[in-house]
Amino acid sequence: MPVNGGNIGPRNLPSLSVASGVWSISDAQIYHGVSLFPVFALVAPTSVDYLVVAGGGGAGGRAGGGGGAGGFLTSTGFAISGSFTVTVGAGGAASETNAGAGAVGSNSVFSTITSTGGGGGGGEGTNPTVGGSGGGGTPGGSAGASATASPAQGNAGGNGLSAFAAGGGGGAGAVGGNGSYPGGYLGGNGGAGTASSITGTSVTYAGGGAGGDGGFSTATGGAGGGGNEGTAGTVNTGGGGGGAFYHDPLGVGDGGSGVVILKYADTSADLTTIGGGLTYTLTTSGGFKVYKFTAGTGTVTI
């Protein structure tokens, strides 16, 4: 009786044999000396998107004006080739004397693009200084300093009022607030900064520092790293330093350092060389390479 299942017919055995030894691509696989399996090298980028933020200005002396934010410049499709300079601006120091103005922040540079450092806040006897954004007016009642950089990179600082209410530093997105007296001396808030999504995440930069006063206020720094009263601007935002309460220690509201960010398609090669004086990170995400320079100066080659 036949049994279902099993194999019918001769066994099918593999007949392919492989020679031992070293294998190589045959002449038939090469056309005019070019392998049919080429390795493609990435080419250098020809344009980049950039964000360049300068260092924020320092706050003025006791109850002094808030520091102005560092200049804010950004654009897309900037043509680039060869070598260029990158510099990340430092924040300006807060005044160490009652009457002194805060120091101006340092410029940040990318190739031919220069963002201007933020203006220093005014002190008891010294007017604020101009910058990417202007410093806040003195507690003696001076006007806030203007934003003089060209192209426009920020806004003016707020005006001071009487002896104990200084103006807030200007921000990239708004002027600094004025000092006021609604039943007590109040320093002006720092001007708001401006948001950028160049890294793939929205981050606000270049807020102005808060104006100082006689001790009754809770003035705040502008969004984007501006220092609250008696507080330094945030590192790598270009935020202005916050003016202190009248009886607080001097020199506490330094400006925040700036930042330089470059972005291009990840189908292009990495930057060839980056000067040893620069501190940076490289991230690749969403189809882009993003170089973030956070300190120093040096030459970069595409």
Regions found by a protein language model. Give the residues of each.
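Extended Gly/Ser/Thr-rich low-complexity repeat segments
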Residues: D27-Q29, A41, V300-I302
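Low-complexity repetitive segments in secreted/extracellular proteins
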Residues: P2, F40-A41
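Low-complexity, glycine/proline-biased repetitive segments and flexible coils/loops
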Residues: P2-W23, T46-I302
